[in-house]
Structures are given as structure tokens and as C-alpha cells.
Curated annotation (Swiss-Prot):
It comes from the Bacteria. Its EC number is 2.7.4.9. This is Thymidylate kinase. It catalyses: dTMP + ATP = dTDP + ADP.
Length: 212
């Protein structure tokens, strides 16, 4: 893989989408990309055509359509397998940069720590579906579960967002553990948008300025 793979993680409401929008404007003029390289921004679930259909199934808030925890895990895994095959690997092999709103560690946090599915089972599945794709750098935008709920109070929640605060606390603790284990760049998402954006940009410059 020749391109760069950047992932932004965090619980809902932490500002991932906002920061990816900022990066999509800045990175092409940052001097970090090679002349022939493009920037691909994507997300999970829903980064591929099949993924968009899976996203609707996964996040459907109709109680009658609620999947079991294991079925939910496998739906996310199917989404990721397609995402890696059709979007991420082709872009990286083409020397492009990929920025993804979530990747495999979200599954560890939500389905592992949140749903209490055995972590080794998840890791074994992920080792297959990721097909060797691994982030060059992961940012963790950290906010408290209470702040997450407050920020989303006027939104119509999807099925995952409708889970209670205890679930969100488990997910958040999972993210913190993973961030420490994998040496992620942790940024307080309670700061203003510009401050967070500047910290992300500075980290990218420090890590990749000599990688062209």
C-alpha cells in the first residue's frame, strides 16, 4: 500500500464529520499529498454502495427489525469487508489518501465493550475482513457520554444512538483502552472546532511531511 490511511474515531457527537470536512478542504493544499494523489473521504457503515444498504439495516430504529448482537456484529463486518475491497484498498494502492469516519476499532468498542461480545472473536473476524488494511494514524476525539447525549439532544437518534448512557459509557471506556494500547492521537473534543482542527493538522504535518 502506497497511500496513507487516516481514521477518526470517537463516540457519537464528538465531531468526526466536522473535522473530516475541515480536512477535505485543507489536505489537498497542505503539501502532504503527492501530485498524482487524490483524497478520499469515507465512513463506516455506508462507505460503499452495498454498505449504504447495510447502514440502513444496521441503524434502523424499528424495534421489530432489531438484530441480535451477533447479527449486528456480522452486518458491520460485511460492510467493512466491502468497504475495504471496493474503496479503501484500491485507493491506497493508487497512492491516494483515505480518511475514514470509523474503522475496525469502532467494532471493538461498540460490539466488544458495548455489547460484551468476546474481543478475540471480533479480532479474528476483523483479521479477515480488513484484508491487511491498517490505519497509518488514528485520531480519537474524546468527549464524555454526558456531553455526547447533550450535543445530540435535538437530533432524531438511530438505533445505536438510542442506547442508554450505560452502553455509551462502556463504549467510551473501550475506546480509551484501545487508544492507549494502539498509541492513538487523543484530542479533547470539548475544545472549539478550530482548536481541534489545528491539532489534527499539526499531527499530520509532524507525521507525514517527509513521507512524499
Amino acid at each position: 500500500m502506497k497511500g496513507k490511511f487516516i481514521v477518526i474515531e470517537g463516540i457519537d457527537g464528538c465531531g468526526k464529520t466536522t473535522q473530516i470536512d475541515e480536512l477535505s478542504k485543507w489536505l489537498p493544499i497542505s503539501g502532504l499529498l503527492k501530485k498524482e494523489s487524490k483524497l478520499i473521504t469515507t465512513r463506516e457503515p455506508g462507505g460503499s454502495l452495498l454498505g449504504k444498504k447495510l447502514r440502513r439495516l444496521i441503524l434502523d430504529n424499528n424495534e421489530n427489525n432489531k438484530p441480535s448482537s451477533l447479527a449486528e456484529l456480522l452486518l458491520y463486518s460485511a460492510d467493512r469487508a466491502e468497504h475495504v475491497s471496493k474503496i479503501i484498498l484500491p485507493a491506497l494502492n493508487n497512492n491516494d489518501w483515505v480518511i475514514s469516519d470509523r474503522f475496525s476499532d469502532s467494532t471493538l468498542a461498540y460490539q466488544g465493550y458495548g455489547r460484551n461480545i468476546n474481543l478475540e472473536i471480533i479480532k479474528n473476524i476483523e483479521s479477515i475482513v480488513c484484508q491487511g488494511a491498517s490505519p497509518d494514524l488514528t485520531f480519537f476525539l474524546e468527549i464524555s457520554p454526558e456531553e455526547s447525549i447533550f450535543r445530540r439532544k435535538n437530533e432524531i437518534p438511530d438505533r445505536i444512538e438510542s442506547e442508554g448512557i450505560r452502553f455509551l459509557e462502556r463504549v467510551n471506556e473501550g475506546f480509551k483502552l484501545i487508544a492507549k494500547q494502539k498509541n492513538w492521537k487523543v484530542i479533547s473534543a470539548s475544545q472549539n472546532i478550530k482548536t481541534i482542527s489545528n491539532q489534527i493538522k499539526e499531527t499530520l504535518l509532524n507525521n507525514f511531511s517527509n513521507a512524499k
